[in-house]
Amino acid sequence: VLYGASSRLGAAYAGASDDVALRFQIFGDQLGLAFQIVDDILDVDGDEEVVGKSLGTDFDKGKLTLPFLWMLREASAGQRVRFREHFTADKASDARRLDAAAQRRLLEGFDLKGGVRYAHERADACLRAAVESLAGLPSNPALDALRSMADYVLHRQR
């Protein structure tokens, strides 16, 4: 929402029509959503040295991000029970704080790569919608930079 609002306000401030400002809002909304999805992917499947922060923090905090939601949808009933126990544990309890080995054991049998793949596909779809929202606008360096930003968001490693 923040990306969309700032994109729309920027366009309006520059004198864009309501229609063009709305297109920029759509661009920003989709870009922001994709950025968050990629951030969720990196927390699950990134390289800690490249990302520059500890991985698995969303999991530790009990945040159900898109890769985990997909995994839950595809999981067996028993797997969902294990997962639910972790995510409903008191945030301050030791049941929520897992070291890397314990996380691997909890996630054993889940299709983590499938969740990452699904999330990546959703991020790609958001970015295609973002770029499409700008279609037909006169080409200029600023629009070219926005289109490049969409590509960066999808392929970023940090």
Residue ranges of predicted features:
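All-alpha prenyltransferase/terpene-synthase fold signal
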Residues: V1-R158
